[in-house]
Amino acid sequence: FSYRRVRSTFRKAVNTQEMEKCMQQEITRVALDAMGGDNAPGELVKGAVDAVNGRSDIKVLLVGQQDVVEKELKQYSYPKEQIEVVHAEEVIETAEPPVNAIRKKKQSSIVVGMNMVKQKEADAFVSAGSSGAILVGGQVIVGRIRGIERPPLAPLIPTEKGVSLLIDCGANVDARASHLVQFAKMGSIYMESVMGKKNPTVGIV
């Protein structure tokens, strides 16, 4: 297992033909789980509208129950070409066993959204829904980067000097030393490639 191989694989994963095409078009397609979270779909729809009203280089694909989502959208003014509703009949609740939910609820907003990424119909998937279902779906549907054994959760934490990446923050309760090394390498690559931080420092909490 090498840092160089992970870096190469990561860059290949984000530099697909679809991403290059998207960059040429200057539009990033984000599939958003409109049914995930405590205040769905209202806050999710509001966030999508705020996002597209603030910039022209993204398109939000709101994944959820079409009639409910469209009802929320009616109260806002936004560029119509930048928001699209993708129907998903089912919702995965937080209390549901993640593996069973992903297997059985094929028409849930989480499964539909992740399949859109897998099928190159979206460039990213965002959800505030069941963390367990998102982790399971990420492995089963989207798949892991080669050489990575466990998917971590990695929120950005505000600090006095900017932001830090906390990885992992609860996805794995029995991580081995090798997993921690993988998390550290992924976190370093993310902070450098996405956040623009040169030579990021890695610490153990």
Residue ranges of model-derived segments:
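Aromatic (phenylalanine/tyrosine) cluster motif
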Residues: 1-3, 10
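Contiguous, glycine/small-aliphatic-enriched amphipathic segments in soluble metabolic enzymes
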Residues: 10-140, 192-203
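Residue-level detector of flexible, active-site-proximal loop/helix-junction positions
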Residues: 90-92, 160, 173
